[in-house]
């Protein structure tokens, strides 16, 4: 494994690029402050240099909360966003799967870099869609995904899981919580859906179990 002096590139870091993206962001974005110890641990485990936007974001931040926390981009971890990409892979949803989780949202969507098991387009960002319980490609890499999150049309992407007062409700959530809907999003229904707040890990586990059931 590469040592920290090989991973941290102070002369050619992508951090200034990310700072420009943050400055120009059109979606509400909060940059969580970095903890040096967490940053060094996360970057060492990730083994990606700060010349890349992903390495720079992990080393330079605790993460990003976008759209008042509706979309959460993993950095090196923070009390308000207690996860980083590598530690996240220890969850059962990623057991034996060549993929690196990089973000999630309040509807239970997980975004991950394809390491080869999600499709043929290795290096592209996929998302685990709660309405299909399948991994679907966004056909973009990490940099394009991050720019989309900061300044893209999130309203269109999330049109099926947003309601009139969604922003006020999202602000009340912590980054360890999410909304579950009933009837479930993977069930076609003409009935109006209700929602409640549950643990994010509980929602992931439920979706994972349902996917396993449907694929048996």
From Swiss-Prot:
It comes from the Bacteria. NCBIfam families: PRK11408.1-1. This is Putative uncharacterized protein YbfG. It comes from Escherichia coli (strain K12).
